[in-house]
């Protein structure tokens, strides 16, 4: 929590036990979005569908890099991004994505 909202705000929330309203949690970056009651599953499914439409190798690498970024210095993070780019650009999915873009069609990623 301190990395997301800062040390002072994290201490305030944790030590007071204050409950945040959804809009405040979104405003301070504690949650990425707020949806109306009863619509959380549909909103999550929509995000999952968007992610699933992307190249699985690229998604996996992006997820790994985001997780890594909070634990390493800038130089290490940039080196990891360069290595990941090399891996992603060497995939069949990268070629499929480029071909689909120029053909103005949806890509058919295979995770290779």
Regions found by a protein language model. Give the residues of each.
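Terminal low-complexity tails and localization/encapsulation signals of metabolic enzymes
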Residues: 99-112
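C-terminal long alpha-helix characteristic of the crotonase
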Residues: 22, 31-79, 86-87, 92, ...
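Short alpha-helical scaffolding segments that buttress acidic/His motifs in well-ordered protein cores
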Residues: 13-17, 62-65, 101
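Hydrophobic alpha-helical segments typical of transmembrane helices
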Residues: 9, 61, 81-84, 97
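Interdomain hinge/lid region at the active-site interface
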Residues: 93-94, 100
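Conserved catalytic cores of soluble enzyme domains
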Residues: 1-30, 45-51
């Amino acid at each position: 929590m301190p990395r997301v909202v800062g040390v002072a705000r994290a201490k305030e929330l944790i030590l007071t036990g204050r409950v945040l309203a959804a809009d405040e949690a979104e405003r301070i970056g504690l949650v990425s979005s707020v949806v109306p009651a009863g619509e959380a599953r549909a909103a999550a499914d929509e995000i999952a569908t968007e992610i699933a439409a992307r190249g699985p190798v690229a998604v996996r690498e992006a997820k790994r890099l985001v997780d890594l970024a909070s634990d390493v210095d800038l130089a290490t993070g940039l080196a990891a991004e360069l290595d990941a780019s090399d891996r992603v650009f060497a995939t069949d999915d990268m070629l499929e994505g480029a071909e689909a873009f120029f053909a103005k069609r949806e890509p058919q990623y295979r995770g290779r």
